[in-house]
């Protein structure tokens, strides 16, 4: 794997934070305090999807009221011996309950405990009945298979990293108190993601190449080189966690010799020492690197602005 070294222009850092206690200043409308909203994975999914940080949308269920029962009431006679009737209706008091949360692919989730809204927090922050559906039809199956409702999967981790980065929070991909309260405020303020949903798909089938998807549409492609057999690129879906405009890469070759390559441009790390970056080769499209995904300088420069922290990278 290609090592991380100090001679670099750093753009993003991954920092770990300890969740802090909620501040008494975290108050909102008279409907209640956002500090009272209990965290759950389902709510995290719902809010990140609502703000367009996920490749899925949350579609609230359409409320269909139950049929109104009809009763017949006999009106006492007044001046005659005959009786007349009139029809009246009564509407019983009911409470809606969630039954399940479903994916468009018919993957179902067992019902979670229902959080019934009360005055402790704004109604907009209560869990709602509904389902999650894919926003984009053309995303590869290898990527789509990573999404599961109500789990800390890599797609949710990447979305949370992206949210943290946009809101100038430490980018950990982990939920903490500060991130949760910031997410709740963003939902109330309808602060949607300011960028398109970007995804990088690296295919090792020859000739090796990558494709950039923006909001589900392929917008850019490049021939690339992935890792050789003794130092392969990590297969799977990962999140960009560290970026440099330029870096000196140094480490040890498989034969034990040392290497040091200064001025490696447009670097986006997505798994350990594996990164997307520019590198000069006589040809591209077949395994040549020590784990990174190499491409021509000009292509790396085009791709780099579209791979902010939290961007998903699938290697297949």
Positions of PLM-derived features:
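Exported/periplasmic cell-wall-interacting domains
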Residues: 171, 193-195, 232-235, 244, ...
